[in-house]
Amino acid sequence: MYIQILGSAAGGGFPQWNCNCVNCAGFRDGSLRAQARTQSSIALSDDGVNWVLCNASPDIRAQLQGFAPMQPGRALRDTGISAIVLMDSQIDHTTGLLSLREGCPHQVWCTDMVHEDLSTGFPLFEMLKHWNGGLNWNRIELQGSFVIPACPNLRFTPFPLRSAAPPYSPHRFDPHPGDNIGLLVEDTRTGGKLFYAPGLGKVDEALAEKMRDADCLLVDGTMWDDDEMQRRGVGTRTGREMGHLAQNGPGGMLDVLEGFPEQRKVLIHINNTNPILDEDSPERAELVRRNVEVAFDGMSIEL
């Protein structure tokens, strides 16, 4: 299985366009050793030719341009994108569909809850019908597994995650299973397994069991501290309120990952305020000590 990190930041990217926090300002003036990052998205393939896009970032055009296999050049109009899987209906994971309209129709896989949000509060399915049929919905059931025909050797097993629906969702304050999902993806030829959960608010034993079954854990790296945005003076909500488990503190993501010594551990969906973006920070050094990696745009993983 080929895994390509197209974008590794949380909403707004890094540096965020309107932010002058320590990280963003430091990156711009050159005092911070860090890499720029676009908003979170990955691509999966079983042959390196046909790719499943997991989430469609607002930065999708730049991400595709930066990854040559996404333009195989087999025809006058072409793309390496064979299907799209949506983990949720958040703006930073779905807006890129608008930029892909010239390639419609697209095969889009998502849950009932995500489809409802994207047909009502943020009606992308309706909007894009005007472009060659738009988006063809393939339902993701929360039980069992599914296979996408373009990548027949990849088996996708979805699981619901505890997180928040977006503000435009009809059930914003009434969470439903399927508002947000993670994926266990297995290459049935190599046996390699990826656990992918960019929005992860809580890890219970059932979820931990799925993590133990994987070779690589690509998980929520949004915030270092739960009150990080408050500390940085750029927001009032905590990570938990937004559906993200912070890395630091008792029961945080680093404590969770300590329980998986055999797996490769990679943080993704990193907020612009997170000190781990600073490659010289003590927080980044702590990740190195714990053998936890930080995803970056252009990172490639094979399982």
Swiss-Prot record:
InterPro entries: Metallo-B-lactamas, PQQ_synth_PqqB, RibonucZ/Hydroxyglut_hydro. GO terms for biological process: pyrroloquinoline quinone biosynthetic process. It comes from the Bacteria. Keywords: PQQ biosynthesis, Transport. Pathway: Cofactor biosynthesis; pyrroloquinoline quinone biosynthesis. It holds the Pfam family Lactamase_B_2. PANTHER family: COENZYME PQQ SYNTHESIS PROTEIN B, HYDROLASE C777.06C-RELATED-RELATED. Belongs to the PqqB family. May be involved in the transport of PQQ or its precursor to the periplasm. This is Coenzyme PQQ synthesis protein B. The lineage of its organism: Bacteria, Pseudomonadati, Pseudomonadota, Gammaproteobacteria, Pseudomonadales.
